[in-house]
Amino acid sequence: MGKEKAHVNVVVIGHVDSGKSTTTGHLIYKCGGIDKRTIEKFEKEAAELGKGSFKYAWVLDKLKAERERGITIDIALWKSETPKYMVTVIDAPGHRDFIKNMITGTSQADCAILIIAGGTGEFEAGISKDGQTREHALLAFTLGVRQLIVAVNKMDTTNWSEARFNEIVKETSNFIKKVGYNPKTVAFVPISGWHGDNMLEPSTNMPWYKGWSKEVKGSSSPATGKTLVDAIDAIEPPVRPSDKPLRLPLQDVYKIGGIGTVPVGRVETGIIKPGMVVSFAPSNVTTEVKSVEMHHEQLAEGLPGDNVGFNVKNVSVKDIRRGDVASDSKNDPAKEAASFNAQVIVLNHPGQIGAGYAPVLDCHTAHIACKFSELIEKIDRRTGKTMEAAPKFVKSGDAAIVKLVPSKPMCVESYNEYPPLGRFAVRDMRQTVAVGVIKSVEKTEGKGGKVTKSAEKAAKKK
């Protein structure tokens, strides 16, 4: 086996018709996410349905349909392998809750792949003012996804035109610069997700294309390559935050006969291990971790990115709930937030938002109404400079620093300290109306806490 490859998470963004499903499907199909048996089954069905040409997008549709029917698809289907990395495609595009998922995200993306349709008229529609592409790119940037790859798709429909590719690179560079990316650090790859050109192998249809090159932090020589897979391999590896204090937002709490209470969630930062005394915020319960397991196997420790279940003693299912955050009681334990200040970007709200507005916030696994108690300042989205102090209201397209007060106990953190607990989506009218990044949190001890016997014993042992 050798050493396991490093993992990277990519999110694929772009306009509905950019061909991102086909491209993602092709990547997963060719790079090993889907086992041969499943492919044969799909191909047979495709042939029977007269989709004999077998569209890669159809693979993705099948996976998505199964996922939406609530059949949990083995997440490996969304994985593919490149020479250097194990790649997980975080959320297949076109998914209804795409924006919410990106924020409360099952995991933070290390890189975004922006798929642009090269066809005449298509490109222009994709990045027009109200375009989805713009919203997705803005979202990725706001949420701290700093690495970007641009794939110019459907080159086959442009007769593999170099002039068209160059025109799109120029326009897209301006476009992503406005969002906040530096085009010099971005690989631009002309592809056909349908025919496979420049996906894994250099295309013979575009002899004019000499490859991409991008600046790399801390290196005087640029990174270069030919294909989309090369570009994925040139992603700078992420640093996983295992040296930070523990933060583990609960997704569920189970009661398991003969074992007891088992909270389940993803380790976002730090490490959880048996014997540790954890406290849950904002529930204010402290207890000892008896065991940690993942996929029904006991673990010596759970690391960032691991989805774990852990058994806690003397805590009932009524004491803790989804949205609570587990942390190490001896190392910067998590606390309830009395209020917090955040930079909010309004994406699509039909009216104007003023003080008193109280939508639902989705932050990590918490889903709680919060009141905009004060609009502190309106700022320039790109530079962060103040444009107006104490504005009366903000509207779509605006960025502002606001003070938020949760309607029920809630635990959040500043984005700088604990990124996964410091970004949120503002939901109203069944859509995401704004996204935010938390600047600072005013913490409170909350109501009287419960410390279990086992926690006291464990503390004495230490």
From Swiss-Prot:
Physiological role: This protein promotes the GTP-dependent binding of aminoacyl-tRNA to the A-site of ribosomes during protein biosynthesis.
Main location: cytoplasm
Species this chain originates from: Serendipita indica (Root endophyte fungus)
Modification type N6,N6,N6-trimethyllysine: residues: K79
Key words of the record: Cytoplasm, Elongation factor, GTP-binding, Methylation, Nucleotide-binding, Protein biosynthesis
Residue span of region G3: 91-94
CDD domains in UniProt: EF1_alpha (cd01883), EF1_alpha_II (cd03693), EF1_alpha_III (cd03705)
Cross-referenced HAMAP family: EF_Tu_A
Region ranges (G1): 14-21
Modified positions (N6-methyllysine) in chain numbering: K3, K30, K318, K392
Binding site residues for GTP: 14-21, 91-95, 153-156
Region (G5): 192-194
Name this polypeptide is given: Elongation factor 1-alpha
Residues with PTM N,N,N-trimethylglycine: G2
Pfam family, one: GTP_EFTU_D2
Residue(s) carrying N6,N6-dimethyllysine: K3, K318
Span list, region G4: 153-156
Domain tr-type G intervals: 5-242
The family this protein is said to belong to: Belongs to the TRAFAC class translation factor GTPase superfamily. Classic translation factor GTPase family. EF-Tu/EF-1A subfamily.
Region (G2): 70-74
GO molecular function: GTP binding; GTPase activity; translation elongation factor activity
Compartment list: Cytoplasm
